[in-house]
Amino acid sequence: MNFLKKATPSLPETVADLKAVHPFYPVGVEIANFIANDKTVGQLLGVFAAGCVVILSATWFLASKAAPQLNKKDKLVVLWFCLSYFSYNHTRMGGAQDLFGQMWKEYAMSDSRYLTSDPFVLCMETVTAVFWGPLSFLMIYFIITMHPLRYPLQAVVSLGQIYGDVLYYATCMFDHYYKSLTYCRPEAYYFWFYFFFMNFIWIVIPGSE
């Protein structure tokens, strides 16, 4: 019996061990081949912000040169779809320890499903990467050239963004309330800033276009 007591750790010890493996929730969720980030949150956010400024500034400049007749609102729509293109495709641009991989792991603090091959998230991100990403890039061309299909395509892509976001929220809330599964860490900013605010943008802006 003494041997069994020594060989079998108590529940608190087991939970502590699991917490030490990775910081994601729910506690004990299996994250295959997890490697902790070697960059701080400040470094990741700084690089992300700088990257957005460079990409969007270059897009604004090129759009102004290619189509000087565009009004300010149309240029802002071009910036949105440019940002959409890079947002939808950045997860395929490298391994887990490159810049984008580490950003993705930081975001996963608010939703660990992105690191566990969750069926819904996997299917949703595949659809967005295959369809909404390239179509967002095509939208930039349609706006600049004033193509007659600009508004129909804009409606389709915007509806797809809203629909995907609503399902994203709904599936997470369903698991939380009906299965008692929480994918977000308990700190408030992970839920309100990462999970809620950063995704709510993809409902508000497409809905106002």
Residue ranges of predicted features:
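N-terminal helical submodule of small eukaryotic multi-pass membrane proteins
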Residues: 3-121, 126
